Amino acid sequence: MSRFHSLLAFVVASLTAVAHAGIGPVADLTITNAAVSPDGFSRQAVVVNGGTPGPLITGNMGDRFQLNVIDNLTNHTMVKSTSIHWHGFFQKGTNWADGPAFINQCPISSGHSFLYDFQVPDQAGTFWYHSHLSTQYCDGLRGPFVVYDPNDPAADLYDVDNDDTVITLVDWYHVAAKLGPAFPLGADATLINGKGRSPSTTTADLSVISVTPGKRYRFRLVSLSCDPNYTFSIDGHNMTIIETDSINTAPLVVDSIQIFAAQRYSFVLEANQAVDNYWIRANPNFGNVGFTGGINSAILRYDGAAAVEPTTTQTTSTAPLNEVNLHPLVTTAVPGSPVAGGVDLAINMAFNFNGTNFFINGTSFTPPTVPVLLQIISGAQNAQDLLPSGSVYSLPSNADIEISFPATAAAPGAPHPFHLHGHAFAVVRSAGSTVYNYDNPIFRDVVSTGTPAAGDNVTIRFRTDNPGPWFLHCHIDFHLEAGFAVVFAEDIPDVASANPVPQAWSDLCPTYDALDPSDQ
């Protein structure tokens, strides 16, 4: 009998461990509505496998990911269809699996499922996933995604890198996105690893991250934000950045990190302070700022410390992260020649806003009824033939492209973080800098486009080696919903042959188009 009880205890312990473990590379993601109260306030949300943020998805470089998304949404106050983007993955040959609704697919209808099936042959690092339909991810459909490299070149810099060292940042709202203002004046709460407090719920539980003295931890910081950027710090501790948006990075020691929506950093933290509790801080750039009552906070707890809230104080940051100091671990050639305009095609993105919608080069993005990928597969071969008119830019194959984003007071809400799908790009001019670096700039997939006050003209470069329509947009989701986006139709003649689509993908549009608008 004792052997049976031992076995039972082992099984229970194993199940408990699995409940907190990452899923993947083959997994079901069931999307439902549920009441959640991550900050002590209960509201209906969009959850993944029962929770928000959704479960950590993990795998190894070289894996084939087969992620079956099952849409069981029923709440009419939120979008009932869905579509999921796997943020940071190049999707080479699987443009149809990238996820943005009406760019790469029709949404998945409620009561239906869709299998995202893609290879990750040459990428590793920290990614995430989120709804790419309307503002649905703000209501909860967002989660972290890590691809491990068995031959990680930074492996000797840390001792621990597991599910428990992923740190997610979430802006949380008490009102569903479609019921609230078009441009909220700040989140109600900041959630760190799914827990937090609002100014009216200061007794809610906070996340605790445990460390063992003397160990070195690779923390993977992921901004799942819909809007604010955060200044992240841990009292009494420096952080050594080793990864930027899944790009291995030359080690850089900082004491605070400004992280914009959708960006990721890995940093090494050495647990070398006195055994105690230390505040983890993620201060948003607007809204409920500061730390009164434990808002915008979590707890770093050394093994052996009492289970109490920290009493540590924040010191002035003397080594904040500056993007110009980030460099790839392995120097990577910058596309084009090392002079201004030394590319095959340079495009300037002129921003504007009319009080309701954002514009790029005079056009506000409105989702087409037929996905751009389907338009191309169906025979449209020129940008002028692709909808939405004025928002699709044709890019030639195997060309060096430069994009500039001059900051302007005409587009309020800066700094706007811009994300390019299907690529990592070289940031040849960063926000806050007037220097053009063609030598060793960081590569990443989300960049702050800075502020007009700084006279910023953030400039990026990439090479067109990945046929397909790829979204370029502000990752403040409320701004994207207001049209702050364009589509790059890359190598149009080769899109169909390079991206064979499964029958299930072809079935998405007829199913979605048959829905009553109230069920979409």
UniProtKB/Swiss-Prot annotation:
Subcellular location: Secreted
Main enzyme class: oxidoreductase
Keywords: Copper, Disulfide bond, Glycoprotein, Lignin degradation, Metal-binding, Oxidoreductase, Repeat, Secreted, Signal
Entry-linked Pfam families: Cu-oxidase, Cu-oxidase_2, Cu-oxidase_3
Protein name stated in the entry: Laccase-1
Known glycosylation sites: N72, N75, N229, N238, N354, N361
Protein species of origin: Trametes villosa
Record-listed Cu cation 1 binding positions: H85, H419
Domain of life, per lineage: Eukaryota
Encoding gene (name): LCC1
The EC number(s) this enzyme carries: 1.10.3.2
